[in-house]
Amino acid sequence: MLENENQLTHQFPTLSRWNPMFISDVHKISFHPHLQRYIGFWMGFPIRWIQIVGYIAAIDIYEGKHVLTVDDCSGMVLRVVFIIQDDFSMSKRAISMSPGNVVCVFGKINSFRSEVELIAQSFEELRDPNDEWKAWQKRMRYKKNLTKISKNHHSIIRTPKKSYFPKDHAKELLKCIRQMCKLNVQAGFTIEELIIYLKAKELHLPLVHIFNVENEIVENCDGNHILALNFSLQTLLQHGRIVRKSNSVYMLVTSKDIIRFVIPLMASGLLEAHKVQSIVRDSNPMFITLPLSAIAKHICQFLLRTKGKWRQAKKYTWVRDNQFV
C-alpha cells in the first residue's frame, strides 16, 4: 500500500522520468476516468512524461496553440501541441520547422477527446541521420527492458497493488484544515490532530478513488482513513496550499505569507512571480516547496483588491497601468 506520491514514484520510476516510446505504443496508453488526464498506463506502469522522435508530417496553427503532427514510421502519427502562453519562443520555433524535418520531442501525455496527444515541454531538430537511428535503438531497448520487468514482480520496479488519485477529497480536506486552523494558523497541525478534529466535528470527507493497477478495478477508500488523508496532504503540498514545518507538522499557507513580500516590490511598478518566489523561499526553508503557480495566484488575488490598476504583461508578470496612476 502506498502512502504518498513520493512512494508511488519510488515504486514506479516510469512516472517521473522521460520514457522513450514509439508513437504506436503511445496510442496504447490507457486512461481511466477517475484518474488525472495527464497520467496513463502502459504495460501496467503509470506514465506521464514521454520522448518521441519522428519527422514532421503536418503543421497546424490554432488560436493559442500550434500543433505538429509527427510520424516515426511505427504505423501511427501523434499530435504534438505547443501552448503559446506557456512558451512563446518554443511555439514560434516549432512552426518555423518544415514538413520532413526530424525532431525529438519531450512532453506530457494528455487525454483529449478519447485520443492521446503530447503537450510539448521541449524539442530539438535532429540533423544527423545517425541520431534518428540511435533513437530508434534506444526505444527498442527501453521497451524490451520494460517488458522483462513487467513479467518479474521481484525486480527493482515492482508493481504496487494500488495507486491513489484524490481530487475532490483534497479540496474538501483543505476546507476542513482552514476551519481547524483559523484561530492559530502559525501553530500548524499534525495528521493525528486532523483525525481528532474530523471525529469531533463529525465531518465525513468524500471517498477516494483507488485504482488497482493489477486488475484495473476502481475501488473506494473511506475519506477519513489515514491513507486517504496522507495522500491528499501530499497533493496540497504540491499545489502550495500547505507546507511542512517539520516531518510530522504541516502549516496552512495564507495570503499574508506571500503578500508581505509583494508590497515592497510594488513601488517599482513591476511584479514578477519568480522574484517573489525566490524571496519567500529565502525567508524560511519551509516555503521551499511553494510552486510558482501558487505564488502567482496569491499575487493575482491581491492585485484585484488593490486601488492601483495593474495588468498582466505576460504569464506570472504584472505591471502598473500608467493611465490609472
Swiss-Prot record:
Residues 50-126 bind DNA. It is found in: Nucleus; Chromosome, Telomere. GO terms for cellular component: chromosome, telomeric repeat region; CST complex; nucleus; telomere cap complex. Gene3D superfamilies: Nucleic acid-binding proteins. Its main location: nucleus. InterPro entries: NA-bd_OB-fold, Stn1_N. GO terms for biological process: telomere capping; telomere maintenance. Keywords: Chromosome, DNA-binding, Nucleus, Telomere. SUPFAM superfamilies: Nucleic acid-binding proteins. Pfam families: Stn1 (PF10451). One of its GO terms (molecular function) is single-stranded telomeric DNA binding. Interacts with ten1. Required for telomere maintenance. This is Protein stn1. It comes from Schizosaccharomyces pombe (strain 972 / ATCC 24843).
